[in-house]
Amino acid sequence: MTILDQLAEYSRLRVAEDKKKISLDEIKNIAIQTKNEKLCDFAFEKALKKDDLSFICECKKASPSKGLIEPDFRYLEIAREYEAAGADCISVLTEPKWFLGSDEYLKEIAKTVSIPCIRKDFTVDEYQIYQAKTLGAAAVLLICSILSDVQLGEYIKICDSLGISALVEIHNEKEAGMAVRAGARIIGVNNRNLKDFTVDTANSRKLRDLIPDDIIFVSESGVKSTDDIRAIREIGADAVLIGETLMRADDKKAKLDELRLS
């Protein structure tokens, strides 16, 4: 069983436990009634539709490949730093076992900042989409390799009904076709293989031509330098998601400024 398989299986267990506390029907009703006073519908994808490269900056305490990244996880302070430095969106890890994330991190960050937040988790059930809306998320991550074609299409429709965005993540040619057929409006290429966690930043370049120009294209993971940013700009990406590089920077604002201006 790969790490990704384990993450997906643990997500199913988490959802089963959450449903014991709040049923699917209940979470649906709460989500439908939840209004974001600071953001418009589909604020996440609108934030990525600008002439210049957009930056999605990640708040994460740990990862399966790197272990503990930020022992003193000042998540609200980090989120404020990102927003002050010009981040367009914030990605918040909520997976608790391998990433040491928490729903509370997302809930509090979404209340604190004025830019859209995406719930970074391993979505395997529609329940998690409704849950994300109640936590203040403007978007959710949908990973093709842990979903069927039918699930992906249904989950995108649920997002649309709630006014939130779906960042559909792919890693290869087959998943690119799957995402396009499902009607994804935002497609992210993960440069990290979630089955073995190896990184190849050339993956974004390799898959770029398979994504129509009217779909927002995001390059995810492995971005460390201004050279990486220039390469991403060259392939016509609309946005980049940066995690560990910013989390390990002593001065996150200075590091983001450096990357944004490259």
What role is predicted for each listed range?
Residues 59, 66-167, 173-179, 204-207:
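N-terminal active-site wall of soluble small-molecule enzyme domains
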